[in-house]
Structures are given as C-alpha cells and as structure tokens.
Regions:
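Glycine-rich helix-loop-beta junction characteristic of Rossmann-like nucleotide cofactor-binding loops
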Residues: 22-26
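Non-catalytic C-terminal accessory region of glycerolipid acyltransferases
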Residues: 88-212
C-alpha cells in the first residue's frame, strides 16, 4: 500500500532505515496499539506494518490537501477533539466495531506529536477501549523524531529503533482497571524511550484520581 511505499521512499531519498525489536510480543488477535508519537513517520510505518488497521486521528487532518485525502482512504476513526465527550463516544463505538471485525486500532495516547526528549500525558481512551473489549493493549516506543522531526521539512539519515512491548491485560474491570493499565503502558513507553533516545527525559505524573 501507499504507506509502505512512503517508508521505502524515505529510505531511498532520505536514508532513513529502521530496526524492529519485540516481534515475538505481537499477539495473534488484533488489539489496541498504544504508540509513542513524535513524527509523521510512525503513522506511515505502523499503518503499513499492522494490517488491517484503523487509526484514531483528529478529524481536521482529513482536510489537509493530499495528506488528509490519503488518510481518508485508510478509513480512520476520525474524532472531533473540540467535543471531548463526543470524541470518546466515537472512539468507543467505532473502535469496538473495528476490533470485532478483526482490525488493529492504532491510538497515539499523547494526542499529538511530542518533541524529542519529552513525554506527553497518556489519555485513557485507548485503555478504556481495550478493557471494554476484553483485549490487551500493545505498547510501542520508537525514536523516529531524531530522523523525522516534528517541525520543518528537514529529514535526517539514520536508523529508527522501534520497540514493541509485551501485550498488557487489565487486572479487572471498570475505571480503576482502566487507569492502572494506562499507567503501566505509559510507564513502559517512558522507560523504553529513555533507553533508545539518548536525550529522552523521564516524566513522572501524579497518581491518577480514580472513581471506584
């Protein structure tokens, strides 16, 4: 597909290669993928690597000339972030439908591309979707931002490290289980980023408040 072509093109034109670790952690049955978000590269890579896949993205991206039109062809789960409650309902409904059809659901829980060296707070939408579907989440860390920065057109040659973590299951149900699973996934991504990204800063967050 065109996503694989884009990755091939970046290798040929910009000298951007990649290495993947943790392939043995990929479950046989599709589940919810929670990926670090630094650049556009991982959007192409993960969409081409996990098939079939539905990516959760902000609706306004679909209106970007050419890029947005191409995204629309992938039939993403487009949410309206200006209406948080509606966005959660859209994610829950459409995400569950995709999972039942045997498709992976890709979520960037930080919500936007985060500069190299920083970690954004993980939203719980992805873990809520997984818990309600009785499926695990698959955390993924990478350092694509070193070769493909968030801002600007410049691309830098190098080898991107992609690390697929162990599938994580919730311990129980409800808000408390969702929060605990989300915290585990966020901690794993943060720890792994500290290993593969030399200037990565570990960011600690206060314990999430949970209504039991």
């Amino acid at each position: 597909n065109w996503c694989r072509f884009a990755i091939w093109l970046t290798r040929v034109v910009a000298g951007i290669r990649y290495e993947v670790r943790g392939l043995e952690n990929i479950p046989e049955k599709p589940c919810v993928i929670l990926s670090k978000h630094q650049s556009t590269w991982e959007t192409f890579f993960l969409t081409g690597y996990f098939e079939p896949l539905a990516q959760v993205l902000k609706r306004e991206l679909l209106f970007v000339p050419f890029f947005g039109w191409a995204l629309a062809l992938l039939k993403p789960i487009a949410i309206d972030r200006s209406q948080p409650k509606l966005a959660l309902k859209q994610l829950a409904k459409q995400g569950d439908e995709c999972l039942k059809k045997g498709a992976w659901v890709l979520i960037f829980p930080e919500g936007t591309r985060i500069p190299v060296g920083q970690m954004g707070k993980f939203s719980r939408g992805g873990t809520a979707l997984a818990v309600n579907a009785n499926l695990p989440v698959l955390p993924i860390a990478h350092n694509a931002g070193h070769c493909w920065p968030k801002n600007g057109w410049a691309k830098y040659p190098g080898t991107i490290q992609v690390v697929i973590g162990p599938a994580m299951h919730a311990e129980g149900e409800g808000p408390r289980a969702i929060a605990e699973l989300n915290q585990r996934a966020e901690a794993w991504v943060s720890e792994t980023m500290a290993e593969i990204s030399p200037i990565q800063q570990r960011v600690s967050h206060p314990e999430p408040s949970v209504v039991s």
